Amino acid sequence: VATSGGFSGEQTSTDAVALALAATDGASGYAEQTAWAVRDVDPGAVAREAVEIARRTANAGELAPGSYRAVLGPYALGELLQYFAFDTFSGLALLEERSYLSGKLGERRFDEKVSIADDALDPRGLPKRFDFEGVPKQRVPLVEDGVLRGAVWDLPSAARAGGSRQSTGNAPPPAERRWGPLPFAISVAGGEAESVDELVELVDDGIYVTRLHYLGIVEPRQGILTGMTRDGTFRIRNGKLAEPLVNLRFTVAVPDVLADVPGLTRETTLANEAAFYDERYAYGALVPAIATARFDVTGIGGPPGI
């Protein structure tokens, strides 16, 4: 990167991604692993995970619309939060008053177990040293113990904000500058649960969601998103995974999902589908699995695999 401000620098990075989608008639399963070093990716384990999920999703049943307790696996939580974050934690969106943060900074709006940062320096992710304007990366607290703390900035949005506002090193590629600064390295602090099974045990009656599909932003100021579950949705009964479910349509206010969180796994996963509408990108979200008291199902789709 070379800029008119006098910066000139380069960085080299690598990333390795293994994705597996196992499908038969009426059943499917998905798994992924991402790391900056290929030695840390195990394609065999990814394939086995996807096959096991697919095996368990055969003969899926339906679920009535309603508000359910849920456990979201890391793939599901990662996608949900990345969509939410791009409109919520953007300094430009905040300036234009189209962010959920507008008028709420400093307020506790999420469960106190929830802490979120943008951290492109974390070696567990896909580290970057500077952004597309040459500004050094830094860890940016976004939510601390449920309290809304801030947003990310690039040079134009920081200048527009005025005062002492500085870029946080979140300028996007030139072709995407219209979106303003973006939090490319979402990181959610893990909790106390030692496994996903431990989270499932917290839910007497609810659903487990492996992965999401075709998300869309409905109302950014309220953080409302809609989409479908896919590749492994199950009913939870008496703290155990029970029968598989067809793909479900959901419409959720992400703040509601994060407002009452019984638990999060201690371990975090680098969630990254590696492509967005066929465009390759090397970004991901470091996220745990999460148990939530509210996940709103609004309809059903086809069986897994469709």
Task: Map each language-model feature to its residues.
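N-terminal small-residue-enriched
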Residues: V1-I306
